[in-house]
């Protein structure tokens, strides 16, 4: 069991704090998907307005969507290094090395023609409804954040 301070909105024993948190989140609910969007100049160490805009959306919506001009697969934006650098700026420091992850704990999602990955929807051309895995993990290994960096449009 994870300790939740009495004044935490996640401590459901404190209905007043939870209700205030819930009302604030509902008031901030994005009207359109574009409300989640931040356009990046290309540097994963982005500073100033871009970083502040991403932080604001994370605080308001618990997520942010970023976009960049179309890129070639061999450009730095296409690399796992870009994603890793960016997510670390937002506190995602411990990556989950699940059974299909690469050595760096980052998974490239593409259609797998064989092997273990072929069995799982993220490595197929079947429709997926994203969720954060890890609900079955122990409390000290729960997944509390996720970074997705799309190089190519979905099939």
Segments from the language model and where they lie:
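Fe(II)/2-oxoglutarate oxygenase catalytic core
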Residues: 2-155
């Amino acid at each position: 069991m994870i300790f939740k301070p009495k004044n935490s909105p996640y401590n459901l024993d404190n209905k007043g704090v939870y209700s205030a948190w819930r009302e604030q989140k509902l008031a901030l609910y994005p009207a359109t998907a574009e409300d989640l969007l931040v356009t990046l100049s290309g540097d994963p160490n982005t500073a100033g307005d871009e970083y502040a805009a991403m932080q604001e959306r994370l605080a308001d919506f618990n997520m942010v969507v970023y976009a960049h001009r179309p890129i070639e697969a061999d450009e730095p934006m296409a690399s796992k290094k870009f994603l890793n650098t960016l997510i670390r700026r937002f506190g995602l420091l411990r990556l989950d090395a699940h059974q299909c992850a690469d050595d760096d704990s980052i998974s490239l999602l593409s259609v797998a023609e064989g092997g273990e990955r072929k069995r799982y929807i993220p490595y197929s051309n079947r429709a997926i409804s994203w969720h954060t895995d890890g609900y079955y993990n122990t409390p000290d290994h729960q997944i509390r954040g996720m970074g997705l960096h799309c190089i190519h449009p979905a099939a």
